[in-house]
Amino acid sequence: VPYKGADAELIESIENICYTVVTADNFRGSAIMVAKREPQHMTVDEWRELERNNHDIKYEYIDGHIYAMSSGSLAHGRIANNTIRTLEDALIAGGKACEVYNSDVATRISPTRYTYPDVSVTCDEGDRPAPDKLEVQAPILIVEVLSDSTEAYDRGRKFGLYRACPTIQEYVLVATRYQMIEVYRRTAQGWTAYQAYNPGDKIELISLDVHFPLAALYRNVGVPEGLDEHEGEV
């Protein structure tokens, strides 16, 4: 990965820590994995400096290790944009003072964990937009738009990271191969609530006290309503 930026010394130290593993699948929009070369960690400040100087790829930071974010399909991008627009409209209609951010904005889920969700929502006064603010500090809802390359991660380890963040109350997974939304909710007993929504359903997000039709998220996207019988499971 070609690094750009004035801080060549920092980039050289980062290259001593990690290397990028690229496969043919990367060119079809799958995840680019970054593996550490030596058993040493990058600090949060070093990661922030990397993000400021490198404009080609964004890196999530998890417990000292960085993971490059890949580009998605056109359907993925459209669904993410539809989700942002739909959430903003619902929040405005409900008079909610919340902010909706896209995947350009990092979200802090712990002092040593920062991700770039497809969509993050925060209702915290400290997360109002300002030139000096670079990260969402108190997300209440996270949305990830699924893809073949990231679905296992979004359902597995990444969901575990989000569950450990005390401010997150709901986690939404949006399918791209057919129209279905899954909502996981935190309750007094933990993450025990789950609900799947299908075409024709109205989605209810309890953490934001908003609702909207599932169809709004798939507007102008060529995604079938159901899974083709020959396609198998997600």
Q: What are these regions, as identified by a protein language model?
A:
Residues 2, 9-234:
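Gly/Pro/Ser/Thr-rich low-complexity, intrinsically disordered segments predominantly at protein N-termini
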